[in-house]
């Protein structure tokens, strides 16, 4: 059976979307993926990201956050 481990779950203050990040490991083997689940009311958007894409995306998110008022680049916990 495939293994899904929840890494974090939080709500976005504006829009109230729920974000859940999960590690998804296939029973058959292969590369683990980062599953991103975005919930808006009853609608879900789910996509899987490979490690290289996750690293690139994370760097861009942190760089942007550091340029914004109150941004910490992911150095403080989400509320």
Placement of each model-derived feature along the sequence:
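Positively charged, low-complexity terminal tracts
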Residues: 1-79
């Amino acid at each position: 059976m495939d293994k899904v481990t929840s890494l974090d779950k939080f709500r976005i203050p504006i829009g109230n979307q729920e974000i859940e990040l999960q590690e998804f490991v296939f029973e058959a083997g292969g590369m683990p993926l980062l599953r991103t689940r975005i919930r808006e009311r009853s609608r879900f958007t789910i996509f899987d990201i490979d490690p290289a894409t996750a690293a690139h995306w994370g760097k861009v998110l942190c760089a942007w956050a550091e340029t914004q008022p109150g941004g910490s680049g992911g150095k403080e916990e989400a509320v």
